[in-house]
Amino acid sequence: MCYKLWVFCFGIGILFGPLLAEGKLLWEDCVWIGMERNGSLGLEQVRSEIFPILSREKWKQYLPKLGVHYFGIFSKNPEQIDQEYRDVRLQIQQLLYDGGETEREKQKLEIRKLIHSEEKKLLREKIFKSISIAYLSFQKRQLVDSIYQLRSERYKLEQQKRKKEMELGLSSKSESEWRKVWEVEFQSKWIHSESAKKLAILDLYQTMSLDPNVPISLAGGFTERIRLFDPSSDQMIVNENHPLRRKTRLQIELAELEEESLENDWKPKLVLGGYVGKNGNGGFPLQNEIYGLSVGVQANLGGTSFQSNTQNGIQSEGNGIQRIPGYGPQPVGPGENSFQSGSIGLFDDLGRNKKIFDSKMSLLQAKADWKQSEISFFSQVHSIEIKLHELYQKYNLYLESTKSNLNQHRSKREENKQGLISEIEYLKSEEEVFVGLELLLEPYFQYISTALELVLLLGENPFDNRYYRLEPNRFPSDLSKILADWKDLPQNDIRKINEPIQKKPYPFLMEDPYETR
């Protein structure tokens, strides 16, 4: 998916602003805030700005190189005639042929840019996952804590009732002692639940890059916004363009280009040059026009370098000086002048064989990494899928068990009202529902977290996919119905919160225009 940055800014302003004003943050909001504030992601965004600069530099190698050169000689000796010479010329050089090396360098730069793009995507996924896991963990702890709180309120009411029964002698001492043991265990669990909730919100603050003193409030009703699907209903399709897989393929392409560069370094570089200007033996303005052409050849043959230069020029009048590379200035008279120079450096690149060996090893290493990465990727996907099926089955198992416990508890409640069972039996029945709810929440949130991990590997929308979907409006889910029955409240009396009319686009819209998924 590829979107422009203004879509992101527009989405933030329109969709994110009202929720901040209300102080209620949804899952999407937490992800947006965390990704926007993450320092590592911002740093990688700045680093990516170097690639357009380097690309422009590579393009400049196709352009002619212009330069203005000045050369002067002055000699004033008591026993000789004073000499004065000045030379000003405009020089131009154009690369005609380099064996395709410049084009390969451009391709290498483009591949490095794409590799960096995939690394940024992997970083986004890591940040997205860490924020989402922290958010889901807090939602779970919040639900567990609310269940403990409701249980505590009920117990206080029951405690007042039992106190009167004790005063009237209607309750035995053994029942009172059992309730004290139960109360200690319950309070211990509740203390642990409150601590876990505080740690979960701190973890969420950390993943969102927020100061713990910043006041935020998360919207409730999470179980009424998300709809779970059977993971075995659709056949899984592995994402060919996952950033991890694309990165390893691009690294192979880069290693192949590096090897190709070394294999083609024997091809000569051909440079055509020319100059035009004036020189003279007096002061300015200069009198004599000069111009000429030059041809340069460079090559590397098995670690032995070869250079050759040829220049033909014309001196209109007077005497001039030509500067020959490697030989210094030489005087020339009016008319045509030329020079040829050449040099051979025998085995002056002794490390060439090692460079070739290193490039071959880099290519073999890149292919080995790709193969291992593919095996690990498929293994990870299938292992997560197996775990996902297990969690979904556990969730349904605990769901049915909790429904059964809840129905039995309703019967026990009626029997307790009629005095047919003791308070201990009633408390045990309530304890079964209470423990069942805790057991139910564990696979429920684990399923969503595991499905999120798999969705990121498959390249699907993390808010709307084959495993779950965030709905724009609340709906009565199985879990929310059980929680409503547990609270003993009618479904219509559940407090509503403002929901978004439209689901928010997921944060991979923050990708740069050149990045595709």
Language-model features, listed with the residues they occupy:
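Positively charged n-region of N-terminal signal peptides that target proteins for export
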Residues: M1-L5
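Bacterial N-terminal signal peptides
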Residues: W6-G17
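Regulatory alphaC helix of protein kinase catalytic domains
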Residues: E22-V31
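Acidic, low-complexity, intrinsically disordered peripheral segments
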Residues: E28-D29, L439-R517
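Residue preference for a single heptad-register face of alpha-helical coiled-coils
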Residues: D29, E36, L43, D87, ...
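Small/polar (Gly/Ser/Thr/Ala-rich) solvent-exposed segments
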Residues: G42, K65-Q83, L95-E125, R246, ...
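Membrane-embedded beta-strand positions in outer-membrane beta-barrel channels/transporters
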Residues: R89-Q91, Y135, S294-G296, Q340, ...
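Periplasmic alpha-helical coiled-coil/stalk elements that build and connect Gram-negative outer-membrane
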Residues: K120, K126-R246, Q251-L254, E259-D265, ...
